[in-house]
């Protein structure tokens, strides 16, 4: 297993201090638990169902949530959608979806309900660390709209677009910049 250095672990600490794992498979949950503890997690809570996951999320106020995509009494997309549209303090917390069903459709579905990262099974410790690093050290803007609540789905927004403006707000921003 990869052993990250202390400075890296210190940068992850605010995100990985309290972790919620929602997975009906005890072995998979144990693997994620062990990896998160090696990254400095002080408190890891595991739940097997969507309903319990939502209850615990409200009480625990985790810094990071892992959810399996599907299982008995668990729909990871429904969990994430409900969390994102709730009034819980943790509604903006990074969610990493874990599944063996990594198709374009499932990845798009997860992205469209507000999942930050997608982790395909089987995965290595390096795969998990990379996802945790992405959510902890490369935060994305938050978007709230009628049909979507979650992190900005544009992962690689350079902000250096120099083409024609297409929105009224773009034109207004351009006028302010010229003034």
Regions found by a protein language model. Name each.
Residues 59-71:
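Active-site beta3 strand of CheY-like receiver
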Residues 41-48, 56:
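Short hydrophobic/Thr-rich beta-strand motif most characteristic of the beta2 strand and flanking loop
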Residues 7-12, 137-179:
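CheY-like receiver
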Residues 9, 75-91:
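Short amphipathic alpha-helix used as the core "switch/output" element in two-component signaling
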